[in-house]
Amino acid sequence: MARYLGPKLKLSRREGTDLFLKSGVRAIDSKCKLETAPGQHGARKTRLSEYGVQLREKQKVRRTYGVLEKQFRNYYKDAARTKGNTGENLLTLLETRLDNVVYRMGFGATRAEARQLVSHKSIMVNGSVVNIPSFKVSANDVISIREKSKKQARIIAALEVSSQREKPTWVEVDNTKMEGAFKRLPERSDLSAEINEQLIVELYSK
């Protein structure tokens, strides 16, 4: 399955919420009718079935983190095999992806941009270059920008934008050094309350 390369705002309208696929510190509500689905008949109100609600939630989370369907299903399988709450385990696995951590630290303006930085070998983990976006980051790992990449305009711009918003409590970032520490795994209370991971569990449990 190919990665989606179309308009980012259309995905947010499809899910009815800001998926933070565009850069910037403000939400996109002012320029994007999130309450209206894309397409000619987007204004029509359709009542979703139970399955439809579960599917929409899965698509929302999958698109937020920029993960393909097969990858997402594999994350769910891993989460189900892990001790604890399956839904929370799933979110933790998604949060520990290297591209997501790079985004959370503010080195990339969006997760898509963070993914590019990783793929283009601009990111180091504990002093070694890692170019796999799905690389699993562990507690106390140090993420840094490769020396030759520190002058990239997009990284500097992303750091300027991220300095205007509060960073997650589970990461610690030194903008001057362009490096940060992944202090701990995020707890469920740290993450968005708009995500209903139980719907995803119900979907895959069928």
Curated annotation (Swiss-Prot):
GO cellular component: small ribosomal subunit
This protein's name: Small ribosomal subunit protein uS4
InterPro entries linked: Ribosomal_uS4, Ribosomal_uS4_bac-type, Ribosomal_uS4_CS, Ribosomal_uS4_N, S4_RNA-bd, S4_RNA-bd_sf
MF annotations from Gene Ontology: rRNA binding; structural constituent of ribosome
PANTHER family the record matches: 30S 40S RIBOSOMAL PROTEIN, SMALL RIBOSOMAL SUBUNIT PROTEIN US4M
Record GO biological process: ribosomal small subunit biogenesis; translation
Signal peptide: none
Subunit note: Part of the 30S ribosomal subunit. Contacts protein S5. The interaction surface between S4 and S5 is involved in control of translational fidelity.
Family membership noted in the UniProt record: Belongs to the universal ribosomal protein uS4 family.
Pfam families: Ribosomal_S4, S4
Role noted for this protein: One of the primary rRNA binding proteins, it binds directly to 16S rRNA where it nucleates assembly of the body of the 30S subunit. With S5 and S12 plays an important role in translational accuracy.
Classification lineage: Bacteria, Pseudomonadati, Pseudomonadota, Gammaproteobacteria, Alteromonadales
Organism from which the protein derives: Shewanella woodyi (strain ATCC 51908 / MS32)
Source species, domain of life: Bacteria
Alphabetical UniProt keywords: Ribonucleoprotein, Ribosomal protein, RNA-binding, rRNA-binding
